[in-house]
C-alpha cells in the first residue's frame, strides 16, 4: 500500500468511527415520484443480507446506485429492500427493474407465480438488469430469463472464481461512454449461458481468466467447452425483439469496488440505457465519496467493525 493510500485509509477510519455504519434508517424506501413527474422511474431491488461483512452488501450497494442514478436529470430511482417490493404496483410504473441479490433457487423472482407475471412485464418492453448473484438461475428458470436478458449464470455450466479481470478494451456503445479500460478483482462469473448465436447480445466487459480457474468440479463437457486463454464475457447488453433492453453484470461481490469510477459508471450507464435514458457522451455522472462505502451496511458477523477501504489500483 502506498503512503497516500495508507493516509487516505486513516482518514476513512476516523470518519467511519463517527457514524453508525449499520444505520439504514435514512434510506428512503418505495417512494413514488410526484404525480407530475415526467421522467423515467427505475426500480432498484436489494436482496436480503448475505455472505460476510463487505461482501454481497446488497442494501448498501443499492443505496449507492440510487444516489448515483439521482445525478442524472429526469430519473427517479425507487429503492426496495429484502428482495421484493411490499407494493408490487411499483413494477408497473418502472421503466427498468434492477435486481441485486442472491439468485438461483432462492431468487425472489422465481418464487410462487412471479416468473410468469414478470415475463408479461418484460414482453411489455420493461428493462431488466441483474447484478452479480442475481444473474444466477436454475436452468428451468433460465430459459425464461434468456428472453429478458440474453444470458445468465447456469449452475454446473458457468464458473464463479475470484480473479483480477483486466478490461483492456471496450466496444463503442452507450453503456461504455466515459468508461476507460480498468483492472479490478471481483468474483467475475464467466461461461454464461447465452441465446443462440449471441443474437441481440453485445459483450460490454470481456477479459481472459487465469487458466487455473477453469478446472474445479464442472462436468467434462463444460471443461471441454471452456478453452484455455479464452476471452470471456463478464457483462453484456441485450436488445430484445420486443424492444426491451436487458443487462447482465457478473461483478459486484466486493462492496469496495463501488469506489472505482469505471466500475460504477459502466453499471450506471447500463441501468440508464436499460430504461431508455440517453447516456451522455461523457458517460453518466457518478460522483462518489469513499466514506459512503461504510454507510447502510447489513450487520454481519460478531467481530469488531472493520471499515471497508477502496480497492487498490492495479
Language-model segments: which ranges?
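Helical hinge/lid and interdomain linker segments adjacent to catalytic or ligand-binding clefts
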Residues: 23, 44, 50-130, 134-137
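Extracytoplasmic/secreted proteins, especially bacterial periplasmic and envelope-associated proteins
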Residues: 60, 64, 113, 117, ...
Amino acid at each position: 500500500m502506498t503512503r497516500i493510500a495508507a493516509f487516505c485509509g486513516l482518514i476513512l477510519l476516523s470518519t467511519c468511527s463517527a457514524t453508525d455504519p449499520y444505520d439504514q434508517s435514512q434510506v428512503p424506501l418505495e417512494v413514488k415520484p410526484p404525480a407530475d413527474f415526467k421522467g423515467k422511474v427505475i426500480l432498484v431491488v436489494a436482496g436480503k443480507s448475505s455472505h460476510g461483512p463487505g461482501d454481497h452488501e446488497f442494501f448498501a450497494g443499492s443505496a449507492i446506485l440510487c444516489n448515483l442514478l439521482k445525478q442524472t436529470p429526469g430519473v427517479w430511482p425507487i429503492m426496495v429492500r429484502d428482495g421484493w417490493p411490499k407494493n408490487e404496483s411499483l413494477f408497473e410504473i418502472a421503466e427498468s427493474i434492477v435486481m441485486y441479490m442472491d439468485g438461483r433457487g432462492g431468487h425472489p423472482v422465481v418464487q410462487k407465480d412471479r416468473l410468469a407475471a414478470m415475463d408479461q412485464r418484460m414482453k411489455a418492453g420493461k428493462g431488466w438488469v441483474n447484478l452479480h448473484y442475481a444473474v444466477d438461475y436454475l436452468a428451468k428458470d433460465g430459459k425464461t430469463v434468456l428472453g429478458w436478458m440474453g444470458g445468465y449464470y447456469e449452475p454446473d455450466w458457468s464458473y464463479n472464481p475470484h480473479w483480477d479481470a483486466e478490461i483492456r478494451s471496450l466496444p463503442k456503445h452507450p453503456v461504455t461512454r466515459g468508461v476507460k479500460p480498468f483492472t479490478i478483482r471481483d468474483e467475475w462469473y464467466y461461461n454464461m449461458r447465452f441465446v443462440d448465436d449471441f443474437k441481440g447480445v453485445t459483450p460490454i466487459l470481456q477479459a481472459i481468466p487465469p487458466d487455473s480457474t477453469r478446472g474445479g468440479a464442472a462436468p467434462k463437457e463444460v471443461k471441454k467447452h471452456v478453452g484455455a486463454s479464452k476471452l470471456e464475457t463478464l457483462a453484456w447488453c441485450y436488445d430484445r425483439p420486443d424492444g426491451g433492453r436487458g443487462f447482465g453484470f457478473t461483478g459486484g461481490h466486493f462492496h469496495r469496488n463501488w469506489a472505482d469510477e469505471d466500475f460504477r459508471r459502466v453499471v450506471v450507464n447500463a441501468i440508464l440505457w436499460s430504461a431508455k435514458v440517453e447516456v451522455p457522451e461523457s458517460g453518466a455522472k457518478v460522483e462518489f465519496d469513499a466514506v459512503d462505502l461504510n454507510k447502510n451496511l447489513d450487520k454481519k458477523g460478531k467481530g469488531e467493525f472493520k471499515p471497508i477501504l477502496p480497492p487498490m489500483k492495479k
